[in-house]
Amino acid sequence: MIRPVGAVVLGIGVMIALCAGVGMVWDQFAPDPSRPQGGAAELALSAIIVSTVGLIAFLYGNRFVSERISRREALLAVSLIWIAAGACGAIPFILGAGMSVDDAFFESVSGLTTTGATVIADIEGRLSRPLLLWRSLIQWLGGMGIVVLFVAVFPNLGAGGKHLFRGEVPGTTAEGLRPRIAETSFALWKLYGAFTIIEIALLKILGLDLFDAVCHAFTTMSTGGFSTLDSSVGGFDSAAVEYVIATFMLIGTVNYGLYYGLLRTGNWRS
């Protein structure tokens, strides 16, 4: 039960490092003087802290409990994963934006659960682009479910992975999507990613810069609603952009199991 939590925490550390690297490259080759500069170093430090904790839990967690996960343990593991993810996701806000622990945890949990509430009053003046990218990414990860991603990346859990998947995605759709849960998880994430890429392309065509297009596609597909602007999507002053974002928000509200069944068999009821 500890090992799955460690794996997800390790994965979050890798994602933070990715945001640090991408954000640093963005600032280097396409600087935006209107936004706070830097932030990559703070995210890199956050990534080191989170990855170290996750690696230790992943490598040594199975020494304290049975490696095989029962259904009851999986439900507890899913709960622990979300709590740990919220705590780890808050570290970049603490180090990169100087937020208090409670505000940072609120922002992180709001993002991961795609709630969309925020405690940041001055987004454009307070958050650097690496941190804005992280803030958008946590909504995208939470939109499909970090546990579903974990099961796809670590397919060797066997029955434990199946119980984790059902703990994250309960109901008849989770029971009958596909015999191999890891393949199902990977297929759902591929579909989710494809919709995201299409939206990024459309927003870029409509005139958004690549950074804003990526961030808003992340928060649109998850139906979370975080923005890189204080005035949100209205700041772009474009009806076409609003229609595209509204369309993909509607797409994001549909159960992805239905999309999967339609693509696989041509039948919604499958």
Regions found by a protein language model. Give the residues of each.
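Membrane-proximal intracellular helices of multi-pass ion channels
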Residues: 1-270
